[in-house]
Amino acid sequence: MKRSFSRVAIVNRGEAALRFIHAALELNREGERLHTIALYTEPDRHAAFVRQADEAFELGPATVEGPDGRRKIAYLDLARLERALRQTRAEAAWPGWGFVAEQPAFADLCERLGVTFIGPSAAAMSALGDKIAAKRLAEGLGIPIVPWAGAPAANESEAERQALQIDFPVVIKASSGTGGRGLREAE
């Protein structure tokens, strides 16, 4: 498949960004041309991923105040990301993992700007962001899954009833969220 972009904004930091930069360098050694653009916040201005990228664009402070008055990570500020993508003339955006990689609104923003989002579609993120809907989808497709209660537990006593039905040990997980945060084993 022919790639239709050469300027890629890296919308992540640290190890994730470095991994992408090193992969791009490897491609470039093979005769490809992938221009890396590190999007970074003030505290990372001297970080290795910023120095090693072909180009770097500062997003500003690491956290910003959201419309609700609460602080949020700058990588989740869509207005800043839109400005960065436009000003750097990015043709693609690679979010890596975490941060904005799990935000369907960022995939939608990229589509609106004509920037290739390197990751799942916003629809796929929305569908799989809800773990209960994702398990039901997998079951419907005949994909083997770990035994489960088939529905969320509304309260502690219902969770206990479901656990007895499945048998111990069980794993308790929030229906949304990623990365195993909130994952608990009960015996």
What residue ranges belong to the model's regions?
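N-terminal beta-alpha lobe that positions the nucleotide/phosphoryl donor
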Residues: M1-E187
